[in-house]
A protein has these predicted regions:
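Short, acidic, small-residue-rich periplasmic hinge/interaction motif at the N-terminus
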Residues: 38, 42-45, 81, 88-141, ...
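Periplasmic N-terminal accessory/gating domains of Gram-negative outer-membrane beta-barrel systems
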Residues: 78, 124-176, 184-202, 207-215, ...
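Transmembrane beta-barrel wall of Gram-negative outer-membrane proteins
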Residues: 248-273, 290-333, 353-371, 375-377, ...
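C-terminal beta-signal and adjacent terminal beta-strands/loops
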Residues: 274-276, 280, 666-676, 701-766
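Flexible loop and strand-edge segments within Gram-negative outer membrane beta-barrel domains
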Residues: 322-371, 379-405, 452
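Surface-exposed extracellular loop regions of Gram-negative outer-membrane beta-barrel proteins
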Residues: 381-383, 438-440, 484, 503-552, ...
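Outer membrane beta-barrel strand-and-loop segments of large Gram-negative receptors
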Residues: 406-410, 450-454, 458-462, 545, ...
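Gram-negative outer-membrane beta-barrel transporters
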Residues: 468, 473, 570-573, 592-675
């Protein structure tokens, strides 16, 4: 780590011999002529704009007074006018008439951007959802390389109490209730290192839309958060390379034109180097992940590695058509051997894969009517083997398999009624093929402990309407699902109402109903990896019912004098949940209990922004409870997601090319159940863990060489004061003798937080 830090300072020293041009200047305008604005920019940044006078002379321009970079002010020009600023080289720019706006961009206008910089540059909030551009996001506390799922955890109401990137609890929901899409490809394992980092390369040029309420009815399949990731459809004019390395992995992202303005290719790859070098960062994550297991140090013989690759081909045959083909590969491999004695070896292997591809076709038939077609395929595969060899001829083994095949198509139409209203409607069909197998065997015999294979086809129709009435905005919607295998259906109304009282105050209210037939259940079999003891199952409307959620929310946004106050209160109830208390090795179906639950809470954000710094505070209150007739005497008890209070405060400061940010995070303890002296459950989530807290800091420095290549270095420190918290108490099923198969007995395992962890990165854009 010391060598990596020295490398950063060395690179900073090299940069000092390069161009020292100031990167930001103060601008402020109120209805000024754009010709004057361009002249001011030319003088400040020593650049030149070429344009046709008739395009610019009639344009006026307004801008809040603060520091702006050249890129930022060019973006504002494009945003406020029907113009496009094109970079010719480092000094010369041309101002042209912008390409004709398509219907999707008009829809975005109706989804007004309420907050331009929410927490940080690169994060916006519309009246319906959040938009994150990872490649533009400023450094966040403790986050390296703008990890998408870790960045989401900075938002109000998003928690990960087990300190993973993928374990997102959104408004009382669990991680399997979140739908994650990548260009339409369903992701069932969006993490590396057992979920400690996201498997979505944040350095790909893409946008992330995050929904936690009033979800557009084109989205179904899950009952909690929606994370819709879309890589760019733009065809670059020249080769672009973005590459980097941090303390865990190296990555590269390449965009290149194949046919000018017609055909473009983008590819990305990211791979760990932990099989050759175990950094202190990896060792810290390893210690966290493999608590309460027999895994020790990793080396060339005992390895854990991961990689992800993606590719996208964009084809624009004409001005009204766009066709793109996307592919994605995510893989995690574990191979660990433990020599117990000379003639006995314990070997554990795990392979987790998520593959997928999608085809997107957008066709604009007129200025008002657009068609979109999506075809997708996704495969998730989990393969775990635990084997103990006693000698050449004797062994015992346990095998666990879980497989999900998800494929389908969507036909979507958009009709722009007028400048203030838009209609979107369509049809979807997709199939889910899900299976799992638990098998125990030796050299003489094999026993299937659990085997399940189900298939379902879902047909869905949806419609969504947006209408502006002056200061009112209405967005009603409806989705209908038919689940063919179980012959069940669901109607899902959605509604968002927004009222703008004045320039400072916006009121909102929303309602939605959603359903879910895919879910994860916990198994307590012979698996030594507590973070991977869940399997995907499909609802059969019997053992595993359909989960259904209703959510109501209301709130307001207040903006004035660089202050922002965002308050949103909500209530949601859920039916069809199950409590898999005993695992798959139980002997009767009564072990699966059906229940219901509710979550009520409020999310609050206060933010202050000025030219060179920003500070914010978020607070969430939440009460989340479940009820099962056969458990806890039928009384409600706290759910695993019930964290009553969470609070964080953060601050970032920019000095020219240097950005520093820090944040302190606190939440009250999770609930946990207790067991008695006999190893039986004594209470259900009646006790609380200690409060959790940590301090994170991050810093980055960006510079350019005379050729215009951009370099960026950064450091993050997670849990600066190395505070160790108990974050989880988990039951582990005991199978000491035959009686344990009849009367369930458990042991309690304690799991602790990460200690202090450093990370460092270096990136280059060519």
């Amino acid at each position: 780590m010391r060598k990596l830090v020295l490398l950063c300072f060395f690179l900073c020293w090299i940069q000092s011999s390069w161009s020292q041009k100031k990167e930001q200047f103060t601008f402020g305008y109120s209805n000024a002529k754009l010709t004057k604005v361009l002249s001011d920019i030319e003088k400040a940044f020593d650049v030149k704009y070429s344009y046709v006078d008739s395009l610019v002379t009639s344009q006026n321009f307004s801008l809040p007074k603060k520091l702006y970079s050249l890129t930022e002010i060019n973006f504002e020009i494009e945003k406020q006018s029907a113009l496009q600023v094109v970079k010719i080289n480092d000094r010369f720019y041309s101002v042209n008439k912008a390409p004709e706006t398509d219907d999707s961009e008009k829809i975005i206008r109706l989804e007004e951007v309420v907050v331009e910089e929410f927490l940080a540059k690169g994060i916006k909030k519309t009246n319906q959802h959040y938009i994150i551009s990872p490649q533009k996001v400023q450094t966040l506390p403790g986050v390296t390389d703008a990890d998408i799922l870790l960045s989401l955890q900075q938002l109000p109401g998003v928690k990960s109490p087990n300190e993973t990137a993928t374990g997102l609890y959104i408004r009382g929901g669990t991680s399997d209730q979140n739908l994650i899409l990548m260009d339409g490809i369903r992701l069932y394992h969006p993490g590396h290192l057992f979920g400690m980092i996201s498997s979505i390369n944040p350095n790909v040029e893409q946008t992330v839309s995050y929904y936690n309420k009033a979800v557009n009815p084109k989205f179904g399949e899950r009952v909690s958060g929606i994370i819709d990731i879309k890589s760019t459809d733009q065809i670059t004019e020249k080769l672009k390379v973005n590459a980097g390395i941090n303390a865990l992995n190296a990555d590269v992202y390449i965009q290149t034109p194949l046919v000018k303005n017609k055909l473009g290719l983008q590819v990305s790859g990211r791979k760990s180097y932990t099989e050759w070098l175990q950094s202190p960062t990896f060792n810290q994550l390893e210690n966290k992940v493999f608590q309460n297991t027999n895994f020790e140090d990793f080396d060339k013989d005992n390895q854990f590695r991961f990689y992800d690759y993606s590719a996208k081909l964009n084809f624009k045959p004409n001005a009204k058509s766009m066709i793109s083909l996307s592919g994605l590969v995510i893989k995690n491999d574990l191979d660990y051997k433990n020599i117990i004695k000379a003639d006995s070896i314990n070997n554990q292997r795990m392979n987790i894969e998520n593959y997928g591809f999608s085809l997107n076709w957008t066709q604009k038939y007129s200025r008002k009517f657009t068609q979109r077609v999506l075809v997708f395929y996704s495969l998730y595969s989990f393969d775990y083997l635990k084997k103990q060899d006693y000698d050449i001829d004797k062994f015992e083994a346990f095998k666990k398999l879980n497989r999900v095949v998800d494929s389908g198509a969507e036909l979507n139409f958009g009709y722009q009624v007028n400048e203030k209203s838009n209609l979107e409607f369509g049809y979807q069909v997709f199939g889910n093929d899900i299976s799992h197998l638990f098998n125990s065997y030796n050299q003489d015999i094999g026993i299937d402990l659990s085997l399940r294979h189900l298939y379902n086809v879902t047909h869905a129709g949806f419609a969504h309407y947006r209408q502006d009435f002056g200061t009112w905005n209405f967005q009603p919607g409806l989705r209908y699902n038919y689940y063919s295998q179980i012959k069940a259906s669901s109607f899902e109304p959605r509604l968002l109402i927004q009222k703008t009282l004045d320039k400072s105050l916006i009121l909102q209210a929303s309602y939605e109903r959603r359903s879910q037939v895919l879910s994860q259940v916990r198994e307590n079999a012979a698996n030594d990896l507590s973070l991977e003891n869940y399997v995907w199952v499909l609802s059969d409307n019997g053992k595993y019912p359909i989960q259904k959620v209703n959510q109501f929310s209301t709130g307001f946004i207040f903006k004035k004098d660089n202050w922002l106050l965002d308050v949103d209160a909500y209530y949601k109830n859920i039916t069809g949940i199950t409590s898999f208390t005993l695992g798959f090795l139980g002997q009767n179906d009564n072990e699966i209990h059906h229940g219901q639950g509710f979550t009520k809470g409020v999310d609050v954000l206060i933010q202050k922004s000025v030219a060179s710094w920003r500070a914010w505070m978020t607070y969430t209150y939440q009460d989340s409870q479940n009820q099962f007739e056969a458990l806890n005497d039928g009384d409600y008890f706290s759910s695993n997601a019930d964290i009553k209070h969470s609070f964080n405060v953060a601050f970032n400061k920019k000095w020219d090319n240097f950005l520093f940010t820090t944040g302190w995070f606190w939440h009250s303890g999770k609930p946990f159940s207790t067991i008695n002296d006999s190893g039986e459950i004594a209470s259900y989530n009646a006790e609380r863990l200690p409060d959790y807290h940590r301090l994170d800091i991050s810093g980055s420095y960006q510079f350019q060489n005379p050729k215009g290549n951009t370099f960026k270095i950064g450091v993050s420190i997670y849990n600066v004061y190395n505070h160790k918290d108990l974050i989880s108490k988990e039951f582990e099923r005991k199978y000491s003798d035959v009686s344990d198969f009849i009367t369930p007995r458990y042991t309690m395992q304690n799991y602790y937080t990460l200690g202090i962890m450093h990370n460092i990165f270096f990136r280059v854009n060519l």
